[in-house]
Amino acid sequence: MELVHGGDWMSYRERFGRDALDFSANVSPLGLPEGVAQAIRDALPLADRYPDPLCRTLRAALSRAEGVPQERILCGNGAADLIFRLVWAVKPHKALVTAPTFAEYASALDTVGCEVKRFFLDETNDFAPTDALVDAVDESIDMVFLCQPNNPTGQLASPELVKKLLRRCGECRTILAVDECFLDFLPDADGWTAKPLLESGDLVILKAFTKLYGMAGVRLGYCLCGDETLLEKMQTAGQPWAVSSLAQAAGAAALKETAYVDEVRALIARQRPVLTAGLRALGLRVIDGKANDLL
């Protein structure tokens, strides 16, 4: 079986008999916060019960943290689960994705036989998105995926560009999915998020605990959307107990780890220029990314 996603440390261990120094998964280098680990241990007595399929306690905590009503929040088994649920709920015939970008968008779209149109970002412009992306959306496009900041380029679309793109999607009756899984690595993430645009029912914001909190193995993500009917369709598009009790407890605990988040952000801000300079000293071209990865 061919795996397109990074982080396949088990295959490396089976082949070479040791663990890899894995640069394929851009997860917090500080590991799982102790408060989250303790929350998982404390939740173990609940392991003999089915988890809350509506993630009510976690959604209440997310509502407070994000400033978004609970009714506009859906939790899933990682952001990838929600990407697939969105595609299965909408069943788009044609979708637009940038290139390069996260591979799971196209993988999900392939499962419903959707035609994937790729908008190739300009390397001479350091792969930065421009108004040309807005122009690529027409009435034949049912869904657009925008990774913000983009994986693997680390580039951001300006808030004004995202607003233009959403306006165009509204005109074309197109769903815009903005993936903000890496956005919270930025100290000024609040200035870049698409949350102020959530009143538009055409916008879905994808987020996850995976990267920032070092929780890739826990599998926990969530999405924000102003269209509650679409969220209900996404809820029923997959299996009902997608988020375990342990993951729900971990997520609620992670939201309290503000000092940990500050430490991760400070570490990335210090080390990004160091790594950039080192790679350039080797003669490599490095794109000035904004998150915790470099292309």
Where are these regions (language model features)?
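N-terminal "arm"/small-domain region of PLP-dependent enzymes with the aminotransferase-like
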Residues: 1-49
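Conserved beta-strand elements of the Class I
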Residues: 21, 74, 94-96
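PLP-dependent aminotransferase-like
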Residues: 88-146
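Short beta-strands and strand-loop turn motifs
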Residues: 118-120, 143-150, 176-180, 287-289
